[in-house]
């Protein structure tokens, strides 16, 4: 069972992530993790913190000479700003007199609408929002991207698949409706300032960000994660918690600021009639073919051999420069919300975080299906399963290739 957990605060010494259940023999380096963390900092509309925030990666355990050992893998992502926060965020007690004159320690008693501040202060009995926002911050996703890098490496090395993402829309920009990108397109996507797969969509997104920035506002958007080449049968129809789509939805909804998830065409499919909602099956010389992929690669909670497509809707960033109305928890008076340094738009980065979470969930499903204590054993099991599936899958035996040609011509 693949399990992961993170620890640490936004302005603490470091974030730490632990991934348990990974097989031995997976190639992984600090540089691999650093590259993924750098991708997380990408995006037009990011705030000043991205300019000087550097992710210092240290692998604390579970990896030797670039290979996983089969035990828990612990990864630390250091905070380069720690010296500025060492007193305020000290784990050990600090003399109140010393804290009194530190501006960073000023009580944060005006909760920000849309953040965890208000509910967290009441739930945990805090008079100050600092303990809440430090852990609730999206900075925590750096730790998840770190362990997600290992999940991606496993999927690539065991199954030969890549996990990629791109931005569909930002704010009210024209949504991208073109072909689904694949791994060969990732470099071009990352080269886009908004991680778009289309120049026209990119221009529309940038215009939205510029307008919001001018108005002192923030924006959300929609990202899509794509995983092509997965075998049939990851996940299960046996019970709700075993369905891969339920696991993916939970993992994506667990990302800060994500308010909606859809698999494949999702909400669009809900507006279609049944005759136009499903992916028809055609015989082909190498197995079955699909005319469409509206289901997003999942049917009955299982992968069906088509590209997995997961979309996530991110709300606008809650820390708005044009401060929103709130209440001062210390007095009960009307107030304006506290304003922490933040971004205008972090949608491009959300795609990278979503990649990590999809990779973790799919890697867990793959390990549950194929098992193994080492990468080589898992690969042997994968090969045997694929061979068995290939022998069971029907193939077109007649010379009539019309169904296959029709499927190829209408695929989308």
UniProtKB/Swiss-Prot annotation:
Reduced FMN (FMNH(2)). Its EC number is 4.2.3.5. The keyword Transcription does not apply. Keywords: Amino-acid biosynthesis, Aromatic amino acid biosynthesis, FAD, Flavoprotein, FMN, Lyase, NADP. SUPFAM superfamilies: Chorismate synthase, AroC. NADP(+) binds at residues 40, 46. Pfam families: Chorismate_synt (PF01264). InterPro entries: Chorismate_synth (IPR000453), Chorismate_synth_AroC_sf (IPR035904), Chorismate_synthase_CS (IPR020541). FMN binds at residues 135-137, 256-257, 300, 315-319, 341. It comes from the Bacteria. One of its GO terms (biological process) is chorismate biosynthetic process. It catalyses: 5-O-(1-carboxyvinyl)-3-phosphoshikimate = chorismate + phosphate. It is an enzyme of class 4 (lyase). Residues 391-404 have a biased composition (Basic and acidic residues). Homotetramer. This is Chorismate synthase. It comes from Mycobacteroides abscessus (strain ATCC 19977 / DSM 44196 / CCUG 20993 / CIP 104536 / JCM 13569 / NCTC 13031 / TMC 1543 / L948).
């Amino acid at each position: 069972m693949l399990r992961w957990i993170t620890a640490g605060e936004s302005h603490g010494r470091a974030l730490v992530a632990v991934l348990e259940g990974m097989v031995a023999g997976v190639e992984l380096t600090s540089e691999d993790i650093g590259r993924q963390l750098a991708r997380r900092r990408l995006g037009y509309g990011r705030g000043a913190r991205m300019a000087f925030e550097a992710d210092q990666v240290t692998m604390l355990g579970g990896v030797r000479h670039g290979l996983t050992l089969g035990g828990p893998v612990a990864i630390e992502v250091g905070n380069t700003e720690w010296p500025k926060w060492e007193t305020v965020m000290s784990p050990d007690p600090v003399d109140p007199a010393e804290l009194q004159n530190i501006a960073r320690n000023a009580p944060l008693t005006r909760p920000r609408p849309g953040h965890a501040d208000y509910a967290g202060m009441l739930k945990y009995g805090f008079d100050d929002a600092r303990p809440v926002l430090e852990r609730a911050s999206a900075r925590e996703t750096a730790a998840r991207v770190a362990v997600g890098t290992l999940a991606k490496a496993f999927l690539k090395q065991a199954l030969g698949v890549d996990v990629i993402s791109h931005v569909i829309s930002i704010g009210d920009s024209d949504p991208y409706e073109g072909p689904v990108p694949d791994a060969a397109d990732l470099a071009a996507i990352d080269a886009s300032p908004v991680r778009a797969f289309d120049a026209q969509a990119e221009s529309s997104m940038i215009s939205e960000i510029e307008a919001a920035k001018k108005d002192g506002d923030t924006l959300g958007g929609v990202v899509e994660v794509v995983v092509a080449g997965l075998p049939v049968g990851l996940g299960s129809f046996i019970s709700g918690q075993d369905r891969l789509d339920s696991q993916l939805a939970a993992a994506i909804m667990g990302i800060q600021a994500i308010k909606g998830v859809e698999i494949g065409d999702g909400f669009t499919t809900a507006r279609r009639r049944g005759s136009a909602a499903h992916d028809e099956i055609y015989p082909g010389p190498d197995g079955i073919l699909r005319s469409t992929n509206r289901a997003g690669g999942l049917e009955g909670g299982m992968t069906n051999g088509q590209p997995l497509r997961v979309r996530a809707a991110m709300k606008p960033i809650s820390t708005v420069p044009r401060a929103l109305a709130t209440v001062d928890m210390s007095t009960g008076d009307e107030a304006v919300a506290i304003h922490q340094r933040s971004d205008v738009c972090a949608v491009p980065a959300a795609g990278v975080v979503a990649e990590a979470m999809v990779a973790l969930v799919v890697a867990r499903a793959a390990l549950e299906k194929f098992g193994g204590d080492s990468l080589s054993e898992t690969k042997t099991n994968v090969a045997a399963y694929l061979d068995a599936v290939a022998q069971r899958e029907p193939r077109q035996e007649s010379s009539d290739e019309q169904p296959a040609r029709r499927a190829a011509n209408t695929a989308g």
